[in-house]
């Protein structure tokens, strides 16, 4: 079961309009800045897309080779691919994906009805299901520093240091 499936389960228990915007904040991204969420809402309102997500600049070569740091390839602010390790993609067109999504309740219902795509299964990236079924994904560029998500024990250690610095 994907994060999108869990969001649908929760959203279905609410009385939402079909065009109601739902923000899906991934649990492994606990340090999501409020201004990024607000930017997503604004960009969703001002751009034609089925799904909205976010990314920011890749900070190091370590990010490029880290499979837990998902990269997004985009053209004119629309995602064309997501990957864990780039192969032949121009590095200047890649950015680090941030685990947040937005979509209407109507689109969410359609997304969860889709079968997982082969690429989604192989790479364990649910957003590939959206792309592989021709759903447009607008990528908001976030220019501020954002604490990395938590995928490994090293990430937990980094999160603890980050939280200690914030106190």
Regions found by a protein language model. Give the residues of each.
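Conserved core of the sugar-phosphate nucleotidyltransferase
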Residues: 32-117
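Short phosphate-binding loop-to-helix
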Residues: 1-25, 29-42
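Short, surface-exposed amphipathic charged segments that create phosphate/polyanion-binding patches used
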Residues: 11-12, 67-70, 154
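Short beta-strands and strand-loop turn motifs
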Residues: 22-25, 52-55, 111, 138-142
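Short, high-confidence coil segments that cap the C-terminus of an alpha-helix
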Residues: 18-19, 47-50, 135
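A short acidic, often aromatic-flanked loop/helix-cap motif at beta-alpha or helix-coil junctions
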Residues: 1-5, 59-60, 145-148
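Conserved alpha/beta core of the MobA/IspD/sugar-nucleotide pyrophosphorylase nucleotidyltransferase superfamily
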Residues: 94-167
């Amino acid at each position: 079961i994907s994060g999108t499936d869990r969001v649908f389960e929760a959203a279905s228990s609410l009385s939402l309009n079909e065009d109601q915007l739902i923000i899906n904040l991934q649990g492994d991204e606990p340090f999501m800045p409020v201004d990024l969420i607000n930017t997503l809402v604004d960009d969703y309102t001002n751009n034609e897309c089925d799904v909205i997500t976010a990314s920011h600049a890749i900070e190091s070569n370590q990010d490029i080779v880290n499979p837990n740091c998902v990269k997004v390839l985009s053209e004119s602010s629309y995602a064309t691919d997501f990957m864990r390790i780039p192969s032949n993609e121009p590095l200047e067109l890649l950015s680090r994906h941030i685990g947040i999504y937005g979509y209407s309740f109507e689109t969410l219902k359609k997304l969860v009805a889709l079968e997982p795509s082969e690429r989604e299964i192989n790479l364990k990236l649910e957003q590939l299901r959206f792309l592989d079924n021709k759903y447009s994904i607008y990528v908001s560029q976030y220019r501020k520093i954002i604490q990395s998500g938590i995928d490994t024990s090293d990430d937990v250690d980094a999160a603890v240091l980050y939280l200690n610095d914030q106190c």
